[in-house]
Amino acid sequence: EILIGLVGSEMCIRDRVNYVPEIHGALRTRIEMNTTQGEYRFQVRNARVSLGGNIASWANYFVQTDLCDQGKMKILDAWARIKPSAQLYFQAGQFRMPFGVETFRAPNNYLFANRSFMGKQMCNYRAVGAKAAYTFAKLPLGIEAGLFSPNAIGDHTGWSKDVAFASKLWYKLRNATFTTGFSSIHPSLVRANLVDASVVWQAGRWHVEGEYMYEHYAHKAHKAAHSYVAFADYTMPVRAWKFNRLSFQGRFDGITAHSSAIAGDDGLLITNNPARNRATLGATISYIHTKSIGLDLRVNYEKYFLHHSTAVTPDLADKAVLELVARF
């Protein structure tokens, strides 16, 4: 009995799991000035809260909601994961489809006040479904793939004969990470297929990224769309009152005429996002307490370059942004 007790205790120590849920979040509040038309607006852009934890050494869960996404409440993520091994896991629920790099950046680690056109307009897909992911033990290589409902995340009751699909492959070589992927969505009457390629380079204080995305619409329902983004971020330690890090950012992004692949009343696709380019310059001073706890004070200036056929609206005008971000 003593031997059994000792063996049992040893197994418990080896299999010790922290079951206490972790709560994290990000609050982004800002003022924007339209420098072209002289208008202002105040926003709570995000009030995001997440809850995650372990059920066992081989299973965990994650739930995330945004209490104020531009004034609206949204349930973003709700999934459970099973990990048969250190290299393999299966995940089911509602979450972001495994496709792209820019789109996976969350509010707590944004480098710019406004997301790129690629991350916000062209590839901003969460869906209900399941995926599998595998990372090779002896190679810096990983792959993810999943099947999803083609319906919007707010509709979990509809039946469909179609599915959406997404996949992602990444490879790391020294300081660079190369990623490519394929996604196929069917949110309305027309299926759209997307391909993506990106490279991320990190060394010392520098972080540089470039990404390209292409979207093709079945049956030539809309002209194919292209999107691209490239940016650089440079950080340095400082001692300025309570702040301890200063960083500078530069970005150039663009998108051609793009449709969300949702048909109008006449059954035809419309152009939801007009063609445009943008250059963004920014600076951020931060208080970094831990990896997940900190405060950012960010200022950005965005210069828009519109095509002749694109009308100037407040959202497409040059703007300055002052933003305060709390991360916990």
PLM features per residue range, with description:
Residues 1-13:
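Single conserved hydrophobic/aromatic residue that forms the stacking wall/gate
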Residues 15-153, 161-165, 169-177, 231, ...:
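Outer membrane beta-barrel
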Residues 17, 41, 72, 122, ...:
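A generic structural micro-feature
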Residues 35-37, 56, 81-83, 103-105, ...:
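Outer-membrane beta-barrel pore domains
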